[in-house]
Regions:
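Glycine-rich, anion-gripping cofactor-binding loops and their flanking helix/strand elements
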Residues: 103-184, 282-287
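Conformationally flexible catalytic loops at phosphate/diphosphate-handling active centers
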Residues: 22, 31-95
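Glycine-rich phosphate/diphosphate-binding loops that line cofactor/substrate pockets in enzymes
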Residues: 28-35, 87-100, 118, 254-260
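Short acidic-hydrophobic, aromatic-tinged amphipathic segments that line or gate anion-handling sites
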Residues: 2-11, 141-148, 200-214
């Protein structure tokens, strides 16, 4: 193809974050690295163009969120080398001793296998999307993440590892948007799957292959409040909607009517959010 990547940037204005611009340009350059060719970048500068002092540009408030990165000789997205077999990250022995959060987005049933037990062994918090097929350790996250005290403690995690993409829960998306620590993405594609444009380490791999290459370290949970809140939510939801006949009640009890070896198709966007917030699906159930 000619060019191998095209980037049509909007007219420059401060509303567009610097990290968005960097990750967008790096994504195009990464495609060029995989397939030699031309990258076309279109920048519609508004006229007239004024002279500017380089010192003023370097100290502009727009660049403040990325000043630390600008002083370091590394890419915004650290793409791990493509290998036939997933290799363990060189610093995994250190990172697995830290406080971590696992977020599981849309995954195939094959890739969903093992994430629950891996996170449980690590003592890390597991946040799951209804599309993940992963049985949550702390269900009803879209509800209990409304607790600002617990959310702030969760944001103190040292590392977040994201499997898959496309999260339905608004509160999980808000958590991801606010997190500022080490961020890893495991997704078997070259597509950009992080709408928040974190500086990150990116693994182009299937989730279960990545888990096999990164053995867990058995340790106690570093944060107990999410488990306590999820148990409270289970009781509260049952009390509020358990005996009623409405959409919320169906969403909460939908796992009771699922056929064995079936596939769940949710076509209404509001009902999808209710199911994501109010129910627990069996491990690996396709949706």
């Amino acid at each position: 193809d000619y060019p191998v990547a095209s980037v049509n940037l909007p007219k420059p204005q401060a509303d567009y974050a610097a990290k968005w611009l960097i990750s967008t340009l790096e994504q195009a350059c990464y495609k060029q690295k995989q397939q030699a060719g031309v990258v076309h970048i279109n920048v519609p500068f508004a006229e007239p163009l004024y002279n500017a002092q380089e010192q003023e540009i370097d100290g502009h408030p727009w660049l403040m969120p990325i000043q630390r990165w600008l002083s370091q000789p590394k890419n915004w997205v650290d793409h791990q080398p493509l290998q036939q077999e997933v290799l363990m990250h060189e610093n995994w022995d250190t990172w697995r001793t830290k406080r971590g959060v696992i977020v599981a987005g849309q995954l195939t049933p094959e890739q969903a296998m093992g994430i629950n037990s891996w996170a449980n062994t690590m003592g890390w918090i597991l946040l799951t999307d209804i599309q993940s097929g992963v049985e949550p350790l702390t269900p009803y996250a879209d509800i209990w993440l409304a607790n600002q005290t617990v959310k702030q403690k969760l944001l103190q995690a040292d590392i977040v590892i994201q499997f898959g993409s496309r999260f339905i829960s608004k509160r999980i998306n808000q958590f991801l948007a606010e997190f500022q620590g080490e961020f890893w993405v495991v997704e078997q594609s070259q597509n950009a799957v992080d709408p928040n444009h974190h500086t990150q380490t990116r693994f182009n791999a299937k989730a279960h292959h990545w888990l096999r290459a990164h053995p867990p370290l058995r340790q106690k949970p570093w944060l107990l409040e999410p488990l306590a809140l999820s148990k409270f939510c289970a009781t509260f939801i049952e009390q509020q909607v358990g005996g009623n006949l409405n959409e919320a009640s169906l969403a909460h009890h939908i796992e009771r009517v699922l056929p064995y070896n079936g596939i769940l198709f949710l076509g209404n966007s509001l009902f999808v959010r209710l199911v994501d917030a109010l129910t627990k699906l069996p491990e690996g159930y396709p949706i």
